[in-house]
Amino acid sequence: FLSAITSLLGKLL
């Protein structure tokens, strides 16, 4: 779950 959030944050940033 956390990995999905981090991946999304990376894409946004």
UniProtKB/Swiss-Prot annotation:
Q: Its Gene Ontology biological processes?
A: defense response to bacterium; defense response to fungus; killing of cells of another organism
For this UniProt record, give its keywords in alphabetical order, as a comma-separated list: Amidation, Amphibian defense peptide, Antibiotic, Antimicrobial, Cytolysis, Fungicide, Hemolysis, Secreted
Annotated Gene Ontology cellular component terms: extracellular region
Q: Chief localization class?
A: secreted
Tissue specificity annotation: Expressed by the skin glands.
The cellular location(s) given in this protein's UniProt record come to: Secreted
In this UniProt entry, the residues modified to Leucine amide are L13
What does the UniProt record say this protein does?
Antibacterial peptide with activity against Gram-positive bacteria (MIC=6 uM against S.aureus). May also show activity against Gram-negative bacteria and fungi. Shows hemolytic activity on human erythrocytes (HC(50)=60 uM).
Homology family: Belongs to the frog skin active peptide (FSAP) family. Temporin subfamily.
Protein name, entry field = Temporin-1SPb
The species this protein belongs to is Lithobates septentrionalis (Mink frog)
